[in-house]
């Protein structure tokens, strides 16, 4: 595989994602990753994020978390606020609220635009409420 091929697959994946064609996008991102030279870390990170987004859109939350973790692991210093926000959303979807709150909080530190930051604050508040309710339910089920 070449960098040009991988870029082509990545761009196709983005277009398919924007059209709501998540399965096709997923396939394109996987082809981009498969053929991408290991030295092209930035493209690999972006393609893993794309995979995460496509998986999230398909309701495949645990798999999306793995994709986001892979992206972060490739280049921890360059992690965007949006990646952390998306991973937080995946954690919230599987009711792992403490992990979601950590991701949302870190995403604020990594830079989000104003509307994203406001949404992030709302998500943190929502997850805190849900985490408390979850803890109460678990405490009741133990008795």
Question: Model-found features: residue ranges?
Answer:
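Terminal, low-structured helical/coil segments at or just beyond the last alpha-helical repeat
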Residues: 106-143
């Amino acid at each position: 595989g070449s960098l040009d091929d991988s870029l082509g697959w990545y761009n196709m994946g983005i277009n398919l994602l924007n059209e709501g064609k998540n399965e096709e996008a997923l396939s394109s991102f996987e082809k981009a990753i498969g053929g991408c030279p290991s030295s092209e870390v930035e493209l690999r990170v972006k393609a893993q994020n794309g995979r995460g987004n496509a998986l999230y859109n398909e309701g495949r939350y645990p798999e999306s978390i793995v994709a986001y973790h892979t992206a972060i692991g490739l280049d921890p210093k360059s992690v965007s606020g949006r990646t952390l926000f998306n991973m937080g959303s995946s954690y919230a979807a599987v009711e792992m609220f403490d992990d979601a709150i950590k991701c949302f909080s870190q995403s604020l530190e990594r830079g989000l635009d104003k509307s994203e930051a406001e949404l992030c604050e709302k998500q943190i508040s929502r997850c805190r409420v849900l985490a408390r309710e979850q803890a109460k339910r678990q405490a009741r089920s133990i008795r």
